Each structure stands twice: as structure tokens, then as C-alpha cells.
């Protein structure tokens, strides 16, 4: 069983492997986990890894989804990094019909798509530069916390900051 002190990004194999991928120049985007309403509450591996984007879930009004896991890491890093819609997310069901679903696993691909678009628009930037842009474009970037992280990113703002 994992203890709080083990959530340092170096204990769990998944976290170490995610950090390795990030160190090789990949952008790893992962969900924070859905333990926010339980007794554990904390971001689960590999969400505690260094140099990755860990995504929590919010409502369409920007309020924290009650199930969204929170940080911080054992070594004091802010997690989740950012948040995206994960409560009543519009998703395609296995039957091909649109439906609603809940989870940080739905917030994460939304963020992944936005990050991919930003990197495509700014191909000369490194993975770590893109991650920093995403964080700094968040609506809570001035005062990040362990609930919303850097907040809801504005990737148009992030893109525009590279065009100056």
C-alpha cells in the first residue's frame, strides 16, 4: 500500500516511467485520479511524476468536481498541474451515440488535445517549454494550489505569448 511519503514521483514504477518519457522529450498528460471524495483524496501515480501534466476535473462552470484527486506531492510539488471539464463531459459511447460521463479520465484527453494543438502551432518549443506555457496560462497561475493546480489553461493566451 502506498503512503503519502511515497507520492514523490520516484516510488511507483508508473511514475518513474512517465518521468523517463518526459525526460526524453515527450509530453505526458495523465489524469489526477478520482479519489477526491474518498478517504485517500490524493493524486495517484503516475500523476505524481515530475515534468508531466497531471489533469484534475472541473464542472463546465469551473468548479472542482467532487471526485477529482488533489495534491500535493510528498516532495511539495503542485499537483494537479491544471484542470479541465470532467463532470458531465460529452463523450461518444461505444454505440456511437453522444452521452455524458464523469472522471478525470475524461478531463485528461481534453487537455491532451489542446496541448497537442499548442505544440503543433509552436513546433520549435521543447516539451518542457510547452508544459510551462500550459501552466502559466492557467487562471490560477499567479497562486497555484493543490486543488486546481495552475487552474484552467487558456491555450490561446499561451500561443499568443509565443508570438511576441
Residue positions per predicted region:
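Structural recognition of the beta-strand scaffold that forms the well-ordered cores
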Residues: 22, 27-31, 53-56, 81-84, ...
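Internal glycine-rich alpha/beta core junctions
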Residues: 68-88
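Structural recognition of alpha->loop->beta junctions
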Residues: 44-60
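Secreted peptidase-domain scaffold signal
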Residues: 33, 158-164
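Acidic, glycine-rich active-site loops and adjacent beta-strand->loop/helix elements
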Residues: 32-36, 58-61, 88, 135-140
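Substrate-binding/access-modulating region of protease and related hydrolase catalytic domains
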Residues: 1-48, 74-77, 92-102, 106-108, ...
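Flexible, small-residue-rich helix->loop connector segments that border functional cores
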Residues: 37, 60, 72-77, 118-124, ...
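Hydrolase catalytic cores
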Residues: 86-148, 152, 156, 160
Amino acid at each position: 500500500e502506498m503512503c503519502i511519503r511515497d507520492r514523490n514521483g520516484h516510488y511507483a514504477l508508473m511514475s518513474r516511467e512517465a518521468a523517463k518519457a518526459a525526460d526524453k522529450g515527450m509530453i505526458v498528460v495523465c489524469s489526477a485520479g478520482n479519489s477526491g471524495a474518498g478517504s485517500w483524496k490524493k493524486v495517484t501515480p503516475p500523476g505524481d511524476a515530475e515534468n508531466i501534466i497531471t489533469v484534475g476535473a472541473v464542472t463546465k462552470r469551473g468548479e472542482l468536481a467532487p471526485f477529482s484527486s488533489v495534491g500535493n506531492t510528498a516532495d511539495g510539488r503542485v499537483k494537479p498541474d491544471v484542470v479541465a471539464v470532467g463532470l458531465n463531459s460529452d463523450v461518444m459511447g461505444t454505440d456511437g451515440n453522444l452521452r455524458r460521463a464523469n472522471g478525470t479520465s475524461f478531463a485528461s484527453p481534453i487537455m491532451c488535445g489542446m496541448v497537442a494543438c499548442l505544440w503543433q502551432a509552436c513546433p520549435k518549443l521543447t516539451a518542457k517549454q510547452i508544459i510551462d506555457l500550459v501552466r502559466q496560462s492557467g487562471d490560477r497561475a499567479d497562486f497555484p494550489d493543490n486543488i486546481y493546480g495552475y487552474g484552467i489553461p487558456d491555450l490561446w493566451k499561451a500561443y499568443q505569448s509565443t508570438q511576441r
